[in-house]
């Protein structure tokens, strides 16, 4: 592994980094590598505990694992950096189910997928790094290519997947429903997960947008999601977070009017630094949408709606960008305008949603489910990053050995934006190839740092 790292680091000082990196093709592939894993033998370790009390630090381990053989259409990537997504938190606390059920199901699909069904799960759904090897049939990518990976793994043998790959019955989230994920020194991806690394970003910055940026793009911009247009009022929950931070940027870029909901003055300030003018600090304003565990408070829905109208000059949201789930969903359905759209992915506060259906059917609103993104949507979202139109939201980074702590902070909402993880990269700030473009956007790139 040291030879691989030295070859990649040589590109840092080279006038021709592409030439340096092409030399990776001549290096042997290590027989094993370090990865962040959960273990099947520990899948019941948190039984009987409340979700909040489950500690990712106890379940995530860094261990040496064998390097898998490449199947046709796959690539082996030396991972310089990755990031924490909420699906890594779910994996680490074995909720809503153990991910070993996903690996077992995938392993039954074919002889090639059987290698995913192991007593350990290498996790992680983001990666930035350098291609080391490609399997048979891969023509677009070659050893030495600097890449980022999106997390849709799809077989594409079903006709439905050729309309929209997210509709393929064999689509899975890499590093969550498949093995050999990105929180590791090496990862295995399908070639159609790869995209060019934005040249003005460091490794940890380039790794961070992947899952959440693509998810926000489909959910908000794509015709498969809310199909946002100029002038739309968009209510964004968690607007300074890993997902909401990208939704806020896309709303601003697209001429929409974001109403950013956050939970602290610091998070409100981050939204303003992104350019948002309309911000609700729901903690400071005392919004409590549930009276107790069983009873919602429609009076609080109404108060939120009044606050939104106060900020917008009397307008209700055309779009509600939902992802907290149980805690906020009743309010989301209520505050959307007549004919408006509640577009939802994830459910970080709970999967069982309750809302008053009268405000949906009688006001002709619609709920749209959105899940990650297809390759085209992910590519377009990455293009916005590469052009400097959308910026990473990395607030802090950890070395691979401290991935458990990074996941713990995301679980406890003790973070802003995205939390990065350095895998092979020894320090932050490496991998920048376009200094001129970076200089134009330095402030925006770093606005989440240190928060």
Residue ranges: model-predicted function:
Residues 11-26, 43-81, 120-122, 137-138:
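A short N-terminal beta-strand-loop micro-motif at the entrance of redox/enzyme domains
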Residues 236, 252-327:
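Adenosine-nucleotide cofactor-binding segment
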Residues 229, 336-337:
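Helix-to-beta-strand junctions that scaffold the AdoMet/dcAdoMet cofactor pocket
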Residues 2-31, 330-334, 375-451:
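C-terminal hydrophobic helical "lid"/dimerization subdomain
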Residues 66-83, 96-158, 198:
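Glycine-rich beta-strand-centered segment in the early N-terminal region that forms part
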Residues 110-119, 125, 153-238:
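NAD(P)H dinucleotide-binding glycine-rich loop of Rossmann-like/cofactor-binding domains
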Residues 347-363:
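Rossmann-fold NAD(P)-binding glycine/threonine-rich loop
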Residues 215, 242-243, 327:
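Hydrophobic/small residue at the entry helix of a nucleotide-binding pocket
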């Amino acid at each position: 592994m040291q030879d691989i790292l030295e070859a990649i680091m040589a590109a840092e000082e080279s006038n021709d980094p592409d030439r340096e990196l092409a030399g990776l093709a001549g290096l042997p592939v290590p027989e094993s590598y370090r990865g962040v894993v959960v273990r099947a033998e520990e899948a019941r370790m948190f039984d009987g505990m409340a979700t909040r009390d489950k500690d990712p630090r106890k379940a995530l381990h860094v261990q040496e694992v064998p390097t898998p053989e490449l199947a046709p259409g796959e690539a082996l990537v030396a991972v310089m950096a990755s990031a924490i997504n909420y699906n890594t938190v779910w994996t680490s606390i074995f909720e809503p189910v153990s991910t070993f059920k996903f690996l077992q199901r995938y392993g039954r699909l074919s002889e090639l997928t059987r290698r995913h069904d192991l007593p350990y799960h290498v996790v992680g759904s983001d990666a930035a790094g350098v291609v080391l090897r490609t399997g048979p049939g891969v023509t677009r990518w070659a050893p030495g290519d600097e890449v980022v990976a999106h997390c849709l793994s799809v077989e594409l043998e079903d006709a439905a997947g050729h309309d929209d790959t997210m509709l393929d019955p064999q689509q899975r989230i890499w590093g969550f429903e498949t093995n050999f994920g990105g929180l590791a020194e090496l990862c295995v991806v399908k070639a159609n997960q790869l995209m060019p690394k934005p040249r003005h970003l460091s490794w940890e910055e380039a790794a961070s947008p992947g899952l959440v940026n693509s998810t926000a793009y489909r959910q908000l911009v794509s015709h498969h999601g809310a199909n946002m247009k100029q002038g739309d009022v968009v209510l964004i929950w968690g607007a300074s977070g890993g997902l909401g931070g990208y939704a806020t940027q896309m709303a601003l870029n697209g001429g929409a009017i974001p109403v950013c909901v956050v939970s602290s003055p610091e998070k409100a300030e981050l939204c303003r630094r992104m350019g948002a003018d309309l911000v609700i600090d729901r903690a400071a304003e005392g919004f409590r949408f549930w009276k107790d565990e069983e009873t919602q408070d429609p009076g609080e829905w109404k108060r939120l709606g009044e606050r939104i109208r106060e900020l917008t000059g009397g307008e209700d949201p055309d779009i509600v960008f939902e992802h907290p789930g149980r805690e906020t969903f009743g309010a989301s359905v209520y505050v959307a305008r007549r004919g408006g759209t509640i577009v939802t992915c994830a459910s970080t506060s709970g999967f069982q949603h309750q809302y008053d259906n009268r405000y949906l059917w009688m006001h002709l609103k619609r709920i749209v489910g959105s899940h990650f993104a297809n390759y085209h949507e992910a590519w377009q979202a990455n293009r916005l990053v590469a052009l400097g139109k959308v910026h990473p939201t990395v607030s802090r980074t950890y070395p691979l050995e401290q991935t458990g702590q990074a996941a713990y902070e995301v679980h406890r909402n003790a973070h802003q934006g995205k939390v990065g993880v350095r895998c092979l990269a020894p320090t932050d700030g490496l991998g920048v190839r376009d200094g001129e473009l970076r200089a134009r956007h330095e402030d925006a790139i770093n606005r989440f740092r240190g928060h």
